[in-house]
Amino acid sequence: MRILKPCLRSTCIQCYLCLLLNSHFLTEDGIHVFILGCISAGLPKTEATWQHVISDLKKIEDLIRSIHMDATLYTESDAHPNCKVTAMKCFLLELRVILQESRNSDISDTVENLIILANSSLSSIEYKTESGCKECEELEEKNINEFLKSFIHIVQMFINPS
């Protein structure tokens, strides 16, 4: 069925919505819902901290030592502070390599959690477009232990910006 007058329909929907809300907020429970909704809209968003990312990285480091995983990954060893977001994105892409190469469920779960934590922490940061930074493929390939040490160093740059 095709509606010929969408403007009229949206007006009707707005009227029904207004009537529904007006009747709902006349009750005491409706007022409580409204007040709690306003309060929750003003609460700060809970975000993952970079400390959790570091603890996951250390856990991955221990797990990799225990299973003797050997991989070479693109690693940013001396990132400029103005390129830390670009470097972090490269590290997160390389984590996916660990995810694919690892057959250990503990490592896979921890890596997936770390990717989610780091991405949510990154999304809360306002940053300018970084220019003059190396692309991921331009970085030197290093073993997984060096990769994790450099990753921790980059995360610390987010914790202690200087």
Curated annotation (Swiss-Prot):
<keyword id="KW-1015">Disulfide bond</keyword>
<feature type="disulfide bond">
    <location>
        <begin position="90"/>
        <end position="136"/>
    </location>
</feature>
<dbReference type="GO" id="GO:0035723">
    <property type="term" value="P:interleukin-15-mediated signaling pathway"/>
</dbReference>
<keyword id="KW-0202">Cytokine</keyword>
<dbReference type="GO" id="GO:0005125">
    <property type="term" value="F:cytokine activity"/>
</dbReference>
<dbReference type="InterPro" id="IPR003443">
    <property type="entry name" value="IL-15/IL-21_fam"/>
</dbReference>
<dbReference type="GO" id="GO:0005126">
    <property type="term" value="F:cytokine receptor binding"/>
</dbReference>
<dbReference type="GO" id="GO:0042102">
    <property type="term" value="P:positive regulation of T cell proliferation"/>
</dbReference>
<dbReference type="GO" id="GO:0050731">
    <property type="term" value="P:positive regulation of peptidyl-tyrosine phosphorylation"/>
</dbReference>
<keyword id="KW-0325">Glycoprotein</keyword>
<feature type="signal peptide">
    <location>
        <begin position="1"/>
        <end position="29"/>
    </location>
</feature>
<dbReference type="InterPro" id="IPR020466">
    <property type="entry name" value="IL-15_mml"/>
</dbReference>
<dbReference type="GO" id="GO:0006955">
    <property type="term" value="P:immune response"/>
</dbReference>
<dbReference type="GO" id="GO:0005615">
    <property type="term" value="C:extracellular space"/>
</dbReference>
<feature type="glycosylation site" description="N-linked (GlcNAc...) asparagine">
    <location>
        <position position="119"/>
    </location>
</feature>
<feature type="disulfide bond">
    <location>
        <begin position="83"/>
        <end position="133"/>
    </location>
</feature>
<dbReference type="InterPro" id="IPR009079">
    <property type="entry name" value="4_helix_cytokine-like_core"/>
</dbReference>
<comment type="function">
    <text>Cytokine that plays a major role in the development of inflammatory and protective immune responses to microbial invaders and parasites by modulating immune cells of both the innate and adaptive immune systems. Stimulates the proliferation of natural killer cells, T-cells and B-cells and promotes the secretion of several cytokines. In monocytes, induces the production of IL8 and monocyte chemotactic protein 1/CCL2, two chemokines that attract neutrophils and monocytes respectively to sites of infection.</text>
</comment>
<dbReference type="InterPro" id="IPR020439">
    <property type="entry name" value="IL-15"/>
</dbReference>
<dbReference type="GO" id="GO:0001819">
    <property type="term" value="P:positive regulation of cytokine production"/>
</dbReference>
<protein>
    <recommendedName>
        <fullName>Interleukin-15</fullName>
    </recommendedName>
</protein>
<dbReference type="GO" id="GO:0050766">
    <property type="term" value="P:positive regulation of phagocytosis"/>
</dbReference>
<dbReference type="GO" id="GO:0042119">
    <property type="term" value="P:neutrophil activation"/>
</dbReference>
<dbReference type="Pfam" id="PF02372">
    <property type="entry name" value="IL15"/>
</dbReference>
<keyword id="KW-0964">Secreted</keyword>
<keyword id="KW-0732">Signal</keyword>
<feature type="propeptide">
    <location>
        <begin position="30"/>
        <end position="48"/>
    </location>
</feature>
<comment type="similarity">
    <text>Belongs to the IL-15/IL-21 family.</text>
</comment>
<dbReference type="GO" id="GO:0050778">
    <property type="term" value="P:positive regulation of immune response"/>
</dbReference>
